[in-house]
Amino acid sequence: AEEVLVRDGPAGVTVRAVAAQAGIAPMGVYNRLGGKDGLVDALLIRGFDMLRAAVAGGSEPDLLDRLWACGLRYRDFALANRHFYAIMFEAAIPHEFGSEEVAVHAAAAFEALVQNVDLAAAAGQIQVADPREAAQQIWSTVHGAVALEMRDLVLTPDPAATYRATLLMILRGLAPAT
């Protein structure tokens, strides 16, 4: 399914196309995944797991550097995995986003950001009343910036520089009062 998504985009993800790619009859996809909804769930789970790995995968000793890198990796993930990003956040494949298993994996991706915020707050490198609330605000901001870029709606000459400036604005806004 992943190969079909990457090759053909969200519109190309059909039970028949995935079965052909796997060299099986379409019934095999139904038996294994329960049909189109199960197929899309499997792709969503894979996408959220990849996103979690990207944003959590920091070993920077300075926790502000880790938050900075986390933000950069979010954008890198989206740009490198446009079709996954589209099915995860743009409903590029009509699908009920109600699977409990998908929700668990989506929440785990968010928790990676919460953990980075919590660590930086506990170390006194940022000042937040509630790390989860701050993580939601950070995610909302970077997601908006990435979504605009994905749709070619960034109206500045260098989207990467604009994104970095957005991250800097976020981190300055979280800096402890002096």
PLM-predicted stretches and their roles:
Residues 86, 96-103, 107, 121-168, ...:
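Hydrophobic/aromatic-rich alpha-helical bundle segments in the mid-to-C-terminal region
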Residues 4-38, 42:
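Helix-turn-helix
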Residues 45-69, 98-104, 122:
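Amphipathic alpha-helical linker/stalk segments
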Residues 1-5, 13, 47, 51, ...:
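Short hydrophobic clusters on alpha-helical segments that form packing/core surfaces
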Residues 116, 169-177:
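C-terminal alpha-helix
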Residues 1-2, 18, 43-51, 55, ...:
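Generic hydrophobic, amphipathic alpha-helix propensity
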Residues 56-84, 134-138:
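Hydrophobic alpha-helical connector segments
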Residues 1, 19-22, 71, 135:
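Small-residue (primarily alanine) positions within well-ordered alpha-helices
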